Swiss-Prot record:
Residues 1-19 form the signal peptide. The keyword Oxidoreductase applies. GO terms for biological process: cell redox homeostasis; cytochrome complex assembly. It comes from the Bacteria. GO terms for molecular function: electron transfer activity; protein-disulfide reductase [NAD(P)H] activity. Its EC number is 1.8.1.8. CDD domains: DsbDgamma. This is Thiol:disulfide interchange protein DsbD. Disulfide bonds join 122-128, 185-307, 482-485.
């Protein structure tokens, strides 16, 4: 019996030792993408369900999920709302955990039809997988009678992105409308318009006067709302074209010209003949009657003064970018309501509530020119990138606050000195990105990052290993979509301790952001599951599996790891 027990213990120990052979330090703690995100699908005629089972401790990015049909037509795909995840480099992103089901309506599918599904995810421990692509074969489905054709490519993760990224909400239109009311082309006209609305009657009850003014404003709002709906509908039809770089540049130029008109460089307004005709039509209406006042307001909405043309055009272009019908109509309605509020006050309370006319009205008009200039910066930022976008915002901020400071110097009141100090401080803060760009930022004084040699194929890797001349080699895999890769660059590779240990090491880096065929081949050849992954080769060009790094390491941990791998 004792011999049997001894034999059993020896067997258990040998089993543990055998398992330990496969638990080497270089073994990745992360599972392959197919096990982290188990994908499946099920089709029942027109109804297709895509599903992912997400492993605990992993997540999928909502914006990285895309569906592309081939020889098939599908309805617009709506992804369910995810949970918010935030990191230092990419900010807030919607993600999915545990399980994701996406219903897809197949309007029509021919023989051999497929869906190409692309998705990408990461692990909470700081390990990201390259984009995964799956091909789903579709059963033949006859087109339904009420099926509506959809574009060939549906990028579901970005469905609402253009509208969501617009620079201001519709409520800003209300404030813009109120501001436009105090420009030199509009404010002096309110007493005259008030008299026309009341029909020349001076003794009307407050309620009656308020009602007539409100009806006039609603007539004006009707015209603007209709314009907003038409432009939003047109923008919806050409939404994809409106995101093309050439179109964005063209819109930015138009916005810049509109802003210059607010600065007084030239005048924008309807042809005088058309304005005269509309004015005559308005004069034929009977003031003091609800119907006549409503028509007056509707016609007034079509008569654009030099002060209102540029802001109105800017808002219309903003709406076209959104392609949102509700946003389009609501924005223009609030804009008209903002312009009409001072008129309602004048109609009820008289001229005593209006501020006195003066040069300040021209300053209001100029200020709106700077507001319009923010729109081309917003559009160009999509093309030129975040760094140059920040510099444009900086330039705009310096220009606006500098102009406001110089303008405020004309004031004589003591409290304006506080305003001047605030404006000057804002201008100095705004100039910082331009200063960093021109003279170098303080971060430039930080220790230099590692100097990598780029490789992209297996052949280039073998050639670099052959040219290492007996030196050890480190190969770092990097991608723009890998958060932990950026953390390695910022916190680990910049550390003097790490740089000192790697002083005699040949440094290679493979950028696999594109995830193209040669990237996939390199990853597969080296059995790399995801990023960040760092490989080490000895002086003979052989990989040291036990030294392989998967996942983020801070400078101290990575430095210790480098010391441990050294012979």
């Amino acid at each position: 019996m004792a011999q049997r027990i001894f034999t059993l213990i020896l067997l258990l120990c040998s089993t543990s030792a055998f398992a330990g052979l496969f638990d080497a330090p270089g073994r990745s703690q992360f599972v392959p993408a197919d096990r982290a995100f188990v994908f499946d699908f099920q089709q029942n005629q027109h109804d297709l369900t895509l599903s992912w089972q997400v492993k605990e401790g992993y997540y999928l990015y909502r914006k990285q999920i895309s569906i592309t049909p081939t020889k098939a037509d599908i309805a617009a795909v709506q992804l369910p709302a995810g949970v918010w995840h935030e990191d230092e480099f990419y900010g807030k992103s919607e993600i999915y955990r545990k399980r994701l089901n996406v219903p897809v309506t197949v309007n029509q599918a021919a023989a051999g039809a497929t869906l190409t599904i692309t998705y990408q995810g990461c692990a909470d421990a700081g390990f990201c997988y390259p984009p995964e692509t799956k091909t789903v074969p579709l059963s033949e489905v006859a087109a339904a009678i009420d099926a509506t054709p959809t574009p060939a490519v549906t990028q579901t993760g970005e469905t609402s992105k253009p509208a969501a990224q617009l620079p201001f909400s519709a409520l800003w239109a209300l404030l813009i409308g109120i501001g436009i009311a105090f420009t030199p082309c509009v404010l002096p006209m309110y007493p005259l318009i008030s008299g026309i609305v009341l029909g020349g009657r001076q003794r009307l009850s407050t309620g009656r006067a308020l009602l007539l003014a409100f009806i006039y404003v609603q007539g004006m709002a009707l015209t603007y709302t209709a314009l907003g709906l038409v432009v939003a509908a047109a923008g919806l039809q050409f939404q994809a074209a409106l995101q093309h770089p050439y179109v964005l540049i063209g819109l930015a130029i138009v916005f810049t010209l509109l802003a210059l008109s607010m600065f007084g460089l030239f005048t924008l307004q309807l042809p005088s003949s058309l304005q005269t005709r509309l004015t005559l039509m308005s004069n034929r209406q009977q003031g003091g009657s609800p119907g006549g006042v409503f028509v007056m307001g509707a016609i007034a909405g079509l008569i654009c003064s030099p002060c209102t043309t540029a802001p109105l055009s800017a808002i219309l272009l903003y709406i076209a970018q959104s392609g949102n019908m509700w946003l389009g109509g609501g924005t223009l309605y609030l804009y008209a309501l903002g312009m009409g509020l001072p008129l309602m006050l004048v109609t009820v309370f008289g001229n005593r509530l209006l501020p006195k006319s003066g040069p300040w009205m021209a300053h209001v008009k100029t200020a709106f020119g700077f507001v319009i200039l923010a729109l081309p910066v917003f559009l160009l930022e999509r093309i030129i990138g975040e760094a140059w976008g920040l510099r444009l915002w900086s330039l705009l901020g310096v220009a606006f606050f500098g102009w406001a400071f110089i303008t405020s110097l004309q004031a004589r009141r003591a409290w304006m000195r506080i305003v001047q100090i605030i404006l000057l401080a804002a201008a100095l803060i705004s100039v910082r990105p331009l200063q960093d760009w021109a003279f170098g930022s303080p971060s430039a004084q930080a220790p230099a990052h590692l100097n990598f040699t780029a490789i992209s194929t297996v052949d280039e890797l073998n050639q670099a290993l052959a040219q290492a001349k007996g030196k050890p080699v480190m190969l770092d895999f990097y991608a723009d979509w890998c958060v932990a890769c950026k953390e390695f660059e910022k916190y680990t590779f910049s550390d003097p301790r790490v740089q000192q240990v790697l002083g005699d090491t040949v440094l290679l880096q493979a950028n696999v952001t594109a995830n193209n065929a040669q990237d996939v081949a390199l990853l597969k050849h080296l059995q790399v599951l995801g990023l960040p992954t760092i490989l080490f080769f000895d002086a003979q060009g052989q990989e040291q599996p036990q030294a392989r790094v998967t996942g983020f390491m801070d400078a101290a941990t990575f430095s210790a790891h480098l010391h441990d791998r050294q012979p």
